[in-house]
Amino acid sequence: MKKTIFTGLLMLITALAVNAQNLTGKQWCTVLNDEDGQGIAVALTFEKNGSCGMLIATQQDMKEDGVPITLIAAVTVPGSYKRDGSNLNNQFNNGKAKVEVDYEIKGMDAKTKVLLDKQIKGEISTLKKEFKQVLLDGMPKMDQLKIVSLESKKLVVRNDDDQEIPFYVE
């Protein structure tokens, strides 16, 4: 009898450890659409020490003086999390969010590209603030998540707005 109870407890502990291990040490990725249908890539990471992170990235094609430019913006937001069964309580520190903006200029001669490079680099700091605000404001709430399902390569969570969001390990 004692051996059966011990074996059952051991199996339960092992299952819980495997379940917890499935969440940590991976980058969970998904693509969401904003109000304009623009794709926003989101990645979540959870570490065993209780830290977590969120990476939000988007690409925007635009024209500057008739010249096609592709902007790529990414916001990295650090945080921490606590897991209580199927509940994930995340605290993301938007104040410590870091923004990176990169760009590609298409179809230009080298001389004009250098001039446009200087102009764009001057506007990057303004763009960083705008992208940070737009990306953080446009995101679904990720503070209180309920794990709907957790598999080795797929995580489905439900947020406070009752949206189910699937994430995948790539």
Q: Where are the regions a protein language model picked out?
A:
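Bacterial Sec-dependent N-terminal signal peptides
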Residues: 1-23
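Lipid interaction determinants
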Residues: 19-170
